[in-house]
């Protein structure tokens, strides 16, 4: 679950990087919330989109490892990988689905900027070809 301040930070990052996609990771508490929802997000860690593209994102593997190390040192877990879709709605593309295969159990948070004045943020669990939207 993402609180309003982290949600605002996520949207700000997407707007700052436009027209290119933004990307990063979210740290979460190591256990599910009391109400059975997704674990509570406690931190946002921006990453560099090495593709520098409005159509896709790439994060250098060494940067991913540094981010995960920092998250775990703080006593948290990797909960989500986030990025933006600068021209479309926040629904996983085939590229997202393919990439998610390497990160089972990690949520995919997508900021849709098809209308930059009214961004949409959605989160998904992607398992193989199955896409399940989860509550933010």
Go through the PLM ranges and name each one.
Residues 84:
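Metallo-beta-lactamase
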Residues 1-78, 87-136:
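Conserved beta-strand-loop surface patch within small alpha/beta domains used
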């Amino acid at each position: 679950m993402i609180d309003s301040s982290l949600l605002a930070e996520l949207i700000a990052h997407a707007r700052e990087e436009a027209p290119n996609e933004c990307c990063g990771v979210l740290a979460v508490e190591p256990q599910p919330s009391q109400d059975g929802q997704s674990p509570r997000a406690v931190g946002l860690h921006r990453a560099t989109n090495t593709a520098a593209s409005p159509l896709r994102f790439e994060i250098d593997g060494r940067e991913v490892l540094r981010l995960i190390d920092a998250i775990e040192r703080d006593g948290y877990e990797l909960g989500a990988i986030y990025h933006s879709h600068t021209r479309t709605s926040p629904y996983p593309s085939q590229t997202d689905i393919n990439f998610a295969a390497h990160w089972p159990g990690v949520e995919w948070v997508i900021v849709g900027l098809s209308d930059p004045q009214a961004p949409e943020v959605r989160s998904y669990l992607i398992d193989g070809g199955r896409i399940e939207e989860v509550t933010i």
